[in-house]
Amino acid sequence: MTTASAPAPPWPRPRGLLLDAMGTLIGLRTSVGATYAAVAAEHGIDAAPAAIDRAFPGVLRQAPPLAFPGLDGDRLLEAERRWWGERIDAVLGTAAPTALHHALFDRFADPSLWRVYPDVPAVLRRWHGAGLRLAVVSNFDRRLQPLLEGLGLADLFDTVVVSSSAGAAKPSPRPFRIALESLALEASQVWHVGDSAEDGAGARAAGVRCLLVRRP
């Protein structure tokens, strides 16, 4: 895990670390396009993996936040599924059947589709063993907790904050503040590690120092 730049002057040693998930701790084993196309084919829809991979980043950038204030339980799950269904339709360029929406939602909940970056387990164990409080802060939904469990990482974290249930997504400071409250730490006692401009902006807005990593 390499950082974009070393802090100067040195920052005080943190008591806790907040970490982004996708692109920082974990990544997909195969492209989004390959998975979308394979599942779409099971539902009788032809889709080109390369075209999906080209469209997907732009669709996500233009999407409203994956955040649903005031919702929980089944209502939150329904909102998460609907949000992703709209993205699926936009990527495929057609109104896909609800069954395909649900199949893709469930497919990306499968830990076997994901990989932990090689440096992550040892680094997390070292931090955890040193007594640092650890939390995940991610622009994702409630599938993340079972994903981390399936990937063998969940026990290393004191809390997992996802935008869908936090009611706000990075670059909002709200997910960071929820994590800080859960860890019982002040912003000055914590660093955030992420990989995107949203990580940096959200952390700064919450008063948290941020390091950005660059993955190949």
Identify what each model region corresponds to.
Residues 1-17, 27, 41, 50, ...:
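Asp-based, Mg2+/Mn2+-dependent phosphohydrolase catalytic module
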Residues 7-118:
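N-terminal helical cap/lid subdomain that shapes the substrate entry/recognition surface
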